[in-house]
Amino acid sequence: MLAMSPPKPAVELDRHIDLDQAHAVASGGARIVLAPPARDRCRASEARLGAVIREARHVYGLTTGFGPLANRLISGENVRTLQANLVHHLASGVGPVLDWTTARAMVLARLVSIAQGASGASEGTIARLIDLLNSELAPAVPSRGTVGASGDLTPLAHMVLCLQGRGDFLDRDGTRLDGAEGLRRGRLQPLDLSHRDALALVNGTSAMTGIALVNAHACRHLGNWAVALTALLAECLRGRTEAWAAALSDLRPHPGQKDAAARLRARVDGSARVVRHVIAERRLDAGDIGTEPEAGQDAYSLRCAPQVLGAGFDTLAWHDRVLTIELNAVTDNPVFPPDGSVPALHGGNFMGQHVALTSDALATAVTVLAGLAERQIARLTDERLNRGLPPFLHRGPAGLNSGFMGAQVTATALLAEMRATGPASIHSISTNAANQDVVSLGTIAARLCREKIDRWAEILAILALCLAQAAELRCGSGLDGVSPAGKKLVQALREQFPPLETDRPLGQEIAALATHLLQQSPV
């Protein structure tokens, strides 16, 4: 008899979902359940929309055309055709599709917005979103084609096609399924659009929010790796822990700096390989004057690690605060206020400027942190700077074996590529017959941020492989004197990646380790 998989934990959606819960649902680790109060809000919202329709109110996208065609009034008998045509003309995306988790994060973001009860979406539409999230499927959504201004119209239109069985699905391993096969395999009912369902589904910042959600999750893992690897670097280079003292961070109390310094200190606890004494405790006499073999302070890539890492962590924290608000916000237009004070409100909650700016800021922080890791690799592999380790950490005869020389150059190339693109949000371009005369480009910002996160992961993977080699070269295969945390880290790496005894191709190992770093924090 086949063993049954344990049921997934349920995340109950009312007014608020946090980023960890959202990622659990998007990544298939939890199922989503609509809380009774949210269901009641959505039913009330649908009822308010019904009253608007019966009273023939002048409401954008319900009794009007779209965008600059909003001055064309539409009769009630054409509402279904209007909604269908909205999806048809918007489903114009191109480029590679969003990955499985990111596409599901987009679906979840749309559901959370609609569940606030101000969009008038039908109960059946909400059920189709929930069913898709609780399946093992994702919509196949082209990644390019949205300016993130009237929300993410284009990618969300492709989501609607998928829900209708007219677009493709992705299964968990990325295999593409046609609409009919996806509906069958997921045991899904095809979506039937009514009233303004199409506009409620496409008009919002859900694609950029979904991408940003996955970005945030990846950055948390990579940030943990950056701390762990910096601590191990200190052990390999006989680094000084004085610069990580709590008293320094107390005098400059940025939360990220304090956190980074504390975690660095914890990682080297029990190490005999770092220098712990305070320089100023030494008293000089006449015989001490002159040049010492080593400076009393480390280079900035070690000494200033709490400040550099901490600034990045504070940027991520700001990104996460903004993202949490955006995820739980109503980003539709028009909206139907729950208090019923007016039939509908027309505005611009679909403008993705918050996600655009925070994604650009996070991309900048990621590039800075990748630059720190690249400089750490350079110092570790340079025999003039690595305090007695062999050049490029080779084990065989120098010259015959080049060690990590190629990998070090790859790290430099990756960083150069990260620096080749700047912020997206400053490049607003008027479009849509000047109706959208300013646009956020938030989805582009989030996508570019993701590309930089992937490059950072690859640089950290190179650093990790170099450090495992350096630790064994410095301390022997038994890792004598290395901290317990450092030993666990090297041993975990060695379970998958053997020492570089002689030169071998490293590209596949770097890629595999980078994927691991994005998904799991260090031991």
From Swiss-Prot:
Catalytic activity: L-tyrosine = (E)-4-coumarate + NH4(+)
Record flagged with keyword Magnesium: no
GO molecular function: identical protein binding; tyrosine ammonia-lyase activity
Gene3D superfamilies the record matches: Fumarase/aspartase (Central domain), Fumarase/aspartase (N-terminal domain)
Biological-process GO terms, alphabetical: phenylpropanoid biosynthetic process; protein homotetramerization; tyrosine catabolic process
Active site: Y60
Binding site for substrate: H89, R303, N432, A433, A434, N435, Q436
Protein EC: 4.3.1.23
Positions of modified residues (2,3-didehydroalanine (Ser)): S150
Cross-link (5-imidazolinone (Ala-Gly)): A149-G151
Pfam families cross-referenced by the UniProt entry: Lyase_aromatic
Family: Belongs to the PAL/histidase family.
Role: Catalyzes the non-oxidative deamination of L-tyrosine. Has very low phenylalanine ammonia-lyase activity (in vitro).
Subunit structure and binding partners: Homotetramer.
Descriptive protein name: Tyrosine ammonia-lyase
Species, as recorded: Cereibacter sphaeroides (strain ATCC 17023 / DSM 158 / JCM 6121 / CCUG 31486 / LMG 2827 / NBRC 12203 / NCIMB 8253 / ATH 2.4.1.) (Rhodobacter sphaeroides)
Gene: hutH
